[in-house]
């Protein structure tokens, strides 16, 4: 029994070696001359058929080009059509739609932000302008030393003018009264000068 088992074990590697030898063997030595001639004839026939098919394919391609030229479909038009189709296909994809929506949303946010900044700047300038006007018109501004000094200078000038034109007012008066009286005195002076000019013309 042991000898038989050992014999079986020894035959397995031999079978594998035989298969490798068969796979790498040259079958040409196993073929007869008639079989070789038949295979050679079949090989030539296949090569001829392949050559014929290539010629037919080339003729079909030339005919296709002629038809496209007659229809005005040149290479540039085909490229444009392919590009347009590819662009349309890309626009219909979910990824492109999401990207487009994201960019549009971001653009809207940027526009709104710039608008808010412009509004804030305009409001700030408006507040500054109002503050300046309000500061000038405030009583504190009128009571400031600078404004009082200016008012005193004007009042002194007006008083001197009144003295030259028609005399001073012994009772004094406020700044507004001084200006009013000065304007009235100036009007009377102009009227008197006009009457004297007419009288001189009549005497001449």
From Swiss-Prot:
The modification Phosphoserine is found at residues 29, 86, 122, 131, 149, 174. InterPro entries: TPD52. Residues 22-73 form a coiled coil. GO terms for biological process: G2/M transition of mitotic cell cycle; positive regulation of apoptotic signaling pathway; positive regulation of JNK cascade; positive regulation of MAP kinase activity. GO terms for molecular function: identical protein binding; protein homodimerization activity. GO terms for cellular component: cytoplasm; perinuclear region of cytoplasm. Keywords: Coiled coil, Methylation, Phosphoprotein. The modification Omega-N-methylarginine is found at residue 133. Belongs to the TPD52 family. This is Tumor protein D53. It comes from Homo sapiens.
């Amino acid at each position: 029994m042991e000898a038989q088992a050992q014999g079986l074990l020894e035959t397995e590697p031999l079978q594998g070696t035989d298969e490798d030898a068969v796979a790498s063997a040259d079958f040409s030595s196993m073929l007869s001359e008639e079989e070789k001639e038949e295979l050679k004839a079949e090989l030539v026939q296949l090569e001829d058929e392949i050559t014929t098919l290539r010629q037919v394919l080339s003729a079909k391609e030339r005919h296709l080009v002629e038809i496209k030229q007659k229809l005005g479909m040149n290479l540039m038009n085909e490229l444009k059509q392919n590009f347009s189709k590819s662009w349309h296909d890309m626009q219909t994809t979910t990824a492109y739609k999401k990207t487009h929506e994201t960019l549009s949303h971001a653009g809207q946010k940027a526009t709104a932000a710039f608008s808010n900044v412009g509004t804030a700047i305009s409001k700030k300038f408006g507040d500054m302008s109002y503050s300046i006007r309000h500061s000038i018109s405030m009583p504190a501004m009128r009571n400031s030393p600078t404004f009082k000094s200016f008012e005193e200078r004007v009042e002194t000038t007006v008083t001197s003018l009144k003295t030259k034109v028609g005399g001073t007012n012994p009772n004094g008066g406020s700044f507004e009264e001084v200006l009013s009286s000065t304007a009235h005195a100036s009007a009377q002076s102009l009227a008197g000068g006009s009457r004297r000019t007419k009288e001189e013309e009549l005497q001449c």
